């Protein structure tokens, strides 16, 4: 679940695990001396692991996907869509490139994000 790429520690977590198990795996794979990049479907554990993660990439909410359900997504999820920052930790929640359920979107958009990571100077 963890891959070391030069100075980047890439951690991927299975979505079918409990939050506690996901947190346990993240904490086992953190490398303090490296840039820790976490790929995980649901953004819900970020509050519990953000002090150890430099960048976390998530999705799950599809940014609502279909009106009026996007109104419920805004009420239910703290991290719905966007870039969030806390100290030196960043979370990006994407609206994703595909749908869940009906193959359509209404009132939101799909996206593919490109991140350029560069070393600290």
Where are these regions (language model features)?
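Soluble catalytic domains of enzymes that build or remodel membrane lipids, polysaccharides, and related
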Residues: 1-121
């Amino acid at each position: 679940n963890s891959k070391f790429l030069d100075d980047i520690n890439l951690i991927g977590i299975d979505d079918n695990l409990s939050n506690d198990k996901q947190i346990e795996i993240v904490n086992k794979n953190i490398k303090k001396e490296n840039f820790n990049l976490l790929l995980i479907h649901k953004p819900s554990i970020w509050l519990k692991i953000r002090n150890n993660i430099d960048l976390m990439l998530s999705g799950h909410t599809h940014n609502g996907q279909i009106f009026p359900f996007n109104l419920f997504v805004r009420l239910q999820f703290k991290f719905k869509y966007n870039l969030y920052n806390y100290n030196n930790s960043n979370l990006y929640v994407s609206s994703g490139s595909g749908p869940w359920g009906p193959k359509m979107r209404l009132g939101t958009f799909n996206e593919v994000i490109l991140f350029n990571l560069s070393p600290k100077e």
